[in-house]
Amino acid sequence: MSFKDLRSFIDHLEANGELKRIAHPVDPHLEMTEIADRVLRAKGPALLFENPVGKTMPVLANLFGTPKRVAMALGKEDPLALRDVGELLAFLKEPEPPRGFKDAISKIPMFKQALNMPPKTVRNAPCQEVVVSGDEVDLTKLPIQHCWPGDVAPLVTWGLTITKGPRQKRQNLGIYRQQLLGKNKLIMRWLDHRGGALDFKDFKEQHPGERYPVVVALGADPVTILGAVTPVPDAMSEYAFAGLLRGERTEVCKALSCDLEVPATSEIILEGYIEPGEMAEEGPYGDHTGYYNETDEFPVFTVTHVSHRRDAIYHSTYTGRPPDEPAMLGVALNEVFVPILRKQYPEIVDFYLPPEGCSYRMAVISIRKQYPGHAKRVMMGAWSFLRQFMYTKFIIIVDEDVNCRDWNDVIWAITTRMDPKRDTVMIDNTPIDYLDFASPVAGLGSKMGMDATNKWEGETDREWGTPIVMDEAVKQRIDAIWDDLGIDDAPTL
């Protein structure tokens, strides 16, 4: 099942008990965050606040608050099925020629999907049913959430920022938070390595002093939203990838003020420009780390046009100490990463980004170890293979007999298979998340790798312990007589 717009997905969630409408007036200032946070921690439904205090537009929150809803957005019921998305991405990143006739036949579905890649341009798009421009633009009329008591101002959180660089054929979609600065101004908080910032940098070099056109889409269809947070190949547009996932071309329309294309069924579109040199201090804001971050200067986005659907819905979220919505997205997207990593490193059994680690700051990887030093090779590969793991501070490598998603198993492996000096890798002066105030320098810090695998000859001179495992035949005999023993519940093994 694919969803043409956000509204059809909302209807689907509601029909399946995954969305709750809240008619009681709720204030976007702090109250929505408190309600959404309580519901998310209880693994509850998405929320549609129908009567935001002081505003006329309803607010959608916790849309991707469980891995199940992320899977549902892609027409799947089980988050594990998201590995199909990872298989597709692995194919796109490194397509291989067929190894024979059968292999060629097996790849036909992927090549057919590729036909859905180019976006489809439409006219009379729903996102442009209502248009205001110039002096009529007033962003304070939107129900923009003020999430935490220490936040400096309301914050746009789920906007898809659309940019294009002079050297790129594709348009880039990225999600960057945007501080409300005035009736027609937002602060565009994009870090230097992100796609939008790189496009802007290239534009300034080729067109010095010129205004840079930018568009922000709020409330796009769920597949396009997820396409913007998925690690697509650098040369591919998120629109093209969304078309692949959906099985239908992404519908776009030309923006009102520039040549950028916007998701045609979006709820709200903000169009405008960045004036080179116009900067403003951004923050502080409560972030996904669970702390308020430092302030810094970022470009100012001047909004010249606001268009939206009739009876538009404002899509929002909050970030805070995990679990939050980004952490739940991370749990779901974890399954996307597994096939991508396995294609490059077939020895990887499983890969886990614990949500407690702010979605990406720690990774645990289980491998089929094949030679001394193998764990260290996988560490280095994981740090360098995907840009998404550039900020991963800690990597733990375990053997295939350890469930890398079970801390009981992982801690057992660390405490029985590791020597802190021999099996710890420390690397200084590496890229680190700008928001990580624990690093000695903003954006630059260290990484730690932990080899919690069994040690081979060459890694130790000691006789290595053999794990205790019950005889399989005995286990089967006990399984057969368990009900006769009068013990209420058999433990899950």
Swiss-Prot record:
One of its GO terms (cellular component) is plasma membrane. SUPFAM superfamilies: FMN-binding split barrel (SSF50475), UbiD C-terminal domain-like (SSF143968). InterPro entries: UbiD, UbiD-like_C, UbiD-like_N, UbiD_bacteria, UbiD_Rift_dom. GO terms for biological process: ubiquinone biosynthetic process. The active site is at D287 (proton donor). It comes from the Bacteria. Prenylated FMN binds at I175, Y176, R177, R189, W190, L191, R194, G195. Binds 1 prenylated FMN per subunit. It is an enzyme of class 4 (lyase). Its main location: membrane. It holds the Pfam family UbiD. Mn(2+) binds at N172, E238. Keywords: Cell membrane, Decarboxylase, Flavoprotein, FMN, Lyase, Manganese, Membrane, Metal-binding, Ubiquinone biosynthesis. Its cofactor is prenylated FMN; Mn(2+). Its EC number is 4.1.1.98. GO terms for molecular function: 3-octaprenyl-4-hydroxybenzoate carboxy-lyase activity; metal ion binding. Gene3D superfamilies: Single helix bin, UbiD C-terminal domain-like. It is a peripheral membrane protein. It catalyses: a 4-hydroxy-3-(all-trans-polyprenyl)benzoate + H(+) = a 2-(all-trans-polyprenyl)phenol + CO2. PANTHER family: 3-OCTAPRENYL-4-HYDROXYBENZOATE CARBOXY-LYASE-RELATED, FERULIC ACID DECARBOXYLASE 1. Catalyzes the decarboxylation of 3-octaprenyl-4-hydroxy benzoate to 2-octaprenylphenol, an intermediate step in ubiquinone biosynthesis. Homohexamer. NCBIfam families: PRK10922.1, UbiD family decarboxylase. This is 3-octaprenyl-4-hydroxybenzoate carboxy-lyase. It comes from Shewanella loihica (strain ATCC BAA-1088 / PV-4). The lineage of its organism: Bacteria, Pseudomonadati, Pseudomonadota, Gammaproteobacteria, Alteromonadales.
